[in-house]
Amino acid sequence: MPHTVLYVPVPGLEPYIRWRHEEEGPEWLSPDPGHIHAHVTLLGPFAPQSDLTPELVADLTALFAAAPAFDFVLEEIRVFPSGLVHLHPEPAWGFAELTAALTARYPAYPPYAGEFAPVPHLSLCALGPGRDVELVHDELRHLLPVRARAQHVHLVRYEPHGTRVLRTYPLGTGPVLSEARASTS
């Protein structure tokens, strides 16, 4: 079923993530060759595409404009109890703050539909026959660490054979929320 997700793209890991999608879920590959599949999710699933009104788009624009861009590093490979192998961003606070702000603003869309805690991460692959953590370490040895900057957020529609970016929101282009509050007091 089609759904939307808000995420921070991580171009430095795109070759690996694209390859993993080709192996584990090719139907989710975007037909757009410039699409960045490697990402850290902020909120998903998000609003159905039919609910993306001009007011909602404007609200997201303002929310992200008030959030500062930030640097992060992806180096530490971890595994969730479900067997999902992922990279943990350091520092994680920027992702956690954005997710908390989105969750507070849009309580009808809890992170991961309320099934999992909103732990910032970049999904790599699932453990399974012939795929263990040591193999993932070996595959990523030449790519890690990845130093990146969260500068914008993509609103992406996921649909089999039709995944695409609907909108891109820059971070930090407006007054930061705490600065805006200070200037009005």
Where are the regions a protein language model picked out?
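Active-site donor-binding loop signature of nucleotide-sugar glycosyltransferases
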Residues: 89, 158, 171
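Basic, often amphipathic N-terminal segments
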Residues: 1-71, 92-151, 164-185
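Short, conserved acidic/polar surface loops in the N-terminal third of protein domains
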Residues: 83-84, 98
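Short hydrophobic/aromatic-rich beta-strand segments that constitute the beta-sheet cores
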Residues: 86-87, 124, 155
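Short proline/glycine- and acidic-rich turn/helix-capping motifs at secondary-structure junctions
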Residues: 75-82, 120, 153-164
